[in-house]
């Protein structure tokens, strides 16, 4: 409230600062014309926005910070709620020079107002004579660019990857190859291009040989002249005197020559692969077609040719080159022979075989010489290898003999060493046994001498005792008086007193033992008489009182569980009866696992009905064997062993017999 009251005076006082900062504000405003979002953000969070009215100018803050002054000065003119401060060139009726300076504020007001406040107080309304300038039109909304371009880019990339993957998979799968080449545009061309690249990569010299193969010279033959009236006519030509290409003549000589040349080749040439025969037949067929095409059809008259006269072949016959025969059984030579025969076959199929006959003949001779040289080298190598093997065998035999000799020497040395060590050990043992025997003899002699000395000492003592007895006897006989008789009586009385005291102790012990036995019988009676367990603490106190400080009785009483004599324990017959009931329940649960459910309990209950009771068995860890042995031990009265047998149970069986085992242990401790 205090700031709002002081705001008018502060607004008038800041006109001078506004006038000084006018050019700077204009420059900042022009530099920030394109930042509409920043002005919106500032206008949305502008403090005291409700107090700013249209038509009022907002002055810059008095904060000395450059950032605050810049933020308040960069407000745009196109905001409807925020107006820029007036400049000296404004059309307002009130000029900045005509505004009077405000009076100085009082010291109290200056002290109450903080000079660094960043809040823009509202300015009092100013009267304007002219209408406010219209706001500039808003900039056009930004179009969402990039979505269609991004979609198109992703579509092109996806299509390219899918197309490349389809081409690659077409090379791997025949079914997909058919589908891809049939339904995908330009799929067949792409696959064929990749297959051609793969073929060129595998066989780089295939196309070079095809391209560099010389073309056979074509025989154009004579010039063909077609008469003017030799065309197609509606009238069938007459045979009389006419020219027929099926008759014997010059045009048939090429066919006869080709047939004879083919027959000669089939007779002289060896067997070739089917592929080469096919190539030759195709070549022959082509030549026949060419010869047929070269047949001149003229009406010129020539001398008749006799049928008996031998005809000159149109194409001279080519002598074929004989292939190489198999020289040796070596695989390498046979492979080379196959390669040379293949070359000969290819040359025979070509028309230039006569040109290469001499080089091939020389090559065959060189190849035969090479085969003989290889055979000779192999024989020499085989002989050298045999000799080397024989030498190796001899060396091996010599080394083996030397090794056996060394082994025998080492064995002999080891045997001699072992024998020497054995003799040394035997001597050591004999010496040690001699020492032991000598020591034992010395000890035996010492013991015998000591025994003799002891016997002599005992004899001396016995002789002294006899001497004293004899002296005493003689003295007593000599006295023979009343003193000797009194001493005898005194000794007899003392012996009687001793006997009396001993008998009194024996009688007292007998009485105590009898009372203790009666108390123990009372405890047994309390345990065995009643049909229901009852406390026997009184009987136990009587036994403890009669026993006194007897450690055995006190230890036995301390070993009894306090619950047993405070609440009572069942008798032996009750334990046996209860065992029979517990045994039935244990048999029912004998087939249950540890994590059994309701179905397992029901199954075990039904199976226990059809189980047979076993006889007494000394072995076996199953439930039935343990129950049988326990029942036998209870009938014999061996409660301790019966409890140990029942303690060997596991799982639900042990859980069901837990209470019976506790009573059994308490009864065993009490008895």
Curated annotation (Swiss-Prot):
Spans within the Mitochondrial intermembrane topological domain: 172-671
Compositionally biased region (Basic and acidic residues): 258-293
Q: Which InterPro entries match?
A: MIC60
Listed A to Z, the keywords are: Coiled coil, Membrane, Mitochondrion, Mitochondrion inner membrane, Transit peptide, Transmembrane, Transmembrane helix
Locate the compositionally biased regions of type Pro residues. Answer: 121-141
- What does the record note on quaternary structure? Component of the mitochondrial contact site and cristae organizing system (MICOS) complex.
The protein's name in its UniProt record:
MICOS complex subunit MIC60
Instruction: Give the source species.
Output: Arthroderma otae (strain ATCC MYA-4605 / CBS 113480)
Protein's gene: MIC60
